[in-house]
């Protein structure tokens, strides 16, 4: 590369950094809700040595001559820029670049009974009798993970390229990014391609980075990487870092005639067939076929005909490597099957069974009849804690296609994990499985399906009878203790919350009558509420919620309601009479239906789950329409359909059935109103803004805080223009240290309360106090008052214009510098006009009644009382106890917050103070 070429390249990178800064500005109020800017972006003026991911990508790209967009897009498609604290994926990928390291001690060196049991999924006793465990073991032993495979040691290779240790690349983001950049450059050179400054020229390296041994997989990964480059990506990582990849629609990938592929000792090629798959996935097909004796590992059918409609899609993991799983699932002697298998490294989808046929995957015949099974590679590497981005994306694309094709609702009652498949009968406990397990990110997965679950929301009050979706965050805020075989695993984000018999972590863990394992065991889901499930609230307290769960009132930690999302339009189910009704693990027809069809009944067709009961007074969410009990006979190609109607319900972690004749249906209770509750906003020392949602109770006026966004330290004044309601309404203005005023309009969304800021204008640095005064002139718009440094008070009426809504200022009067605090409280006197509270330097509080006059709207002050200099913050959030009168909040110098109830007295309207609680000293702004 010539010296001038390198200068041009450097110039382009500087421009790229500027583009990142532009993206940062464009994300105000969107990427991080109401954040004034994206910190740590390339070109944002951060000091040299900055350790932000954005800077690490820029530095590594420069060092190894890799376009930064390529490096960032590859990382995003591997891990979404997550480090996972150095923990491996379920297939041995590490850190932000997804580099692999799998040694012999990381994977089972022999086939376990649990692996074999995973393939015994027919749920049919006569089929289970023929399950050949020895044959399955034999197949799996031939396909044990080859830890000498270079595809499983990209981390070691990349570490060598940067002369670093494997441990550093595993655990340090900067080392991981440098190693990934070096490996991309190495792959580009191996392909005989130039280290071009054009992103589109890097197709060979990107495809090779996928570690796919097949062209379809390599092309799929490259396609997604270049889509990220063209469309841009942005994210806030679990560590709280904001990262942005600016969109560059001009990039056109240059695909070589021979796409570089990873070498593999034994690559299984697909048969020539047309897959039932979206075109963009370019799926493989390797169908299981009967052997010469006619033995097969599935049941032939003609779905969705003959009443065999497809109602659900079941998510599995393989508990083994890709090659071994593919061999077992396509071997007619394997005993188990599934419709699809998704490889971890590149997201390649292989169809193994036509969807018209019944796969033996769920261990429950009703689910097998009416569901499609999708397996995901995962071979239980020690400490494996996350699934690859390519698996998530391919799976979501496939499942969305299948759901649309077969009319399957895209919700968590129809897109379920294997662990949510019901126990068929009391005798079927051995058929239960717990994949996809606690580390499958259901919240993210459902968002890829276009059905966001409402996780990471602001929460709110709940009431009994209300339907909620449980959405614990898949972040470091939710890292419950887990054990496997009694051995603790390291803390990491998980997709569940623990259930207790009382609202306390010190309470007794919930017990499932069918489980004997310890409550912290990952396989014991009887005391765990999984993300995405919908339940009926049995009781609600501030930070704890009880739901009806498996015949019990089960409590889980739900800070401020933030681990749930209200569900509207849901139907609840209750017992019709006073007597408890049976719960069924499958929906089989009544005995008479078999007789009428001329087929033999199984003998346990009427069996229920006897250790469960659905009692009067309890309530559960209906999980689908009522269906007639049915039972498919593959040998006769006939579906036995009964007359008894069964209703699926979310009874506990699983979907079960009750007889329609024994229950009644009703809508869930309406959500608690948020229009008569008011919030408090606080800023911590790092500049993060927090929202405290009002409860409407004077004794406990606020719910657990909710993070609005970072970057607010750049403002030296912030004031609400109106009361900030719990429903996300209410505007705010903020002044930068440069004197520029910005307007934040309320969105009406509690989880994203402010829209992107609007620039009002400069010159506001002349004021030492800005105060949103509510609607001063009864025109329906909130106004602003400002005090200049000489003590003159000015009124800015709101015209409704944008971006500057304020009319020319009007002088209210002088002498206001005698006060060291001005407080906007709203209407204190009941005349419909907003009043003003002021504290003088001796600690006396004064009330200024609004007369409606102009230009000075305030009457002669009235003395409230002395002693108020004990407080360093006083604000008037509005009516906090729902009695129709605005109250006062004050923080003393020790950090204790106090509530002053408005009694409607005059001139002193306040009752004796009530402590809200301590710990508020960490905030440098409360409004």
Residue ranges of model-derived segments:
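N-terminal export and membrane-targeting signals
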Residues: 2-22
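C-terminal region of N-terminal signal peptides and the immediate post-cleavage residues
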Residues: 13-16, 28-49, 233, 237, ...
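N-terminal catalytic cores of peptidoglycan-degrading enzymes
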Residues: 47-52, 241-363, 552, 558-560, ...
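Catalytic glycan-binding domains that act on GlcNAc-containing polysaccharides
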Residues: 48-231
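Basic/polar, cationic surfaces and motifs that engage anionic cell-wall
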Residues: 215, 221-281, 285-287, 383-492
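SH3/SH3-like beta-barrel superfamily modules
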Residues: 527-559, 610-666
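Intrinsically disordered, low-complexity linker and terminal regions at domain boundaries
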Residues: 559-601
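Trp/Gly-enriched beta-strand/coil motifs that build multi-repeat beta-propeller-like domains
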Residues: 669-927
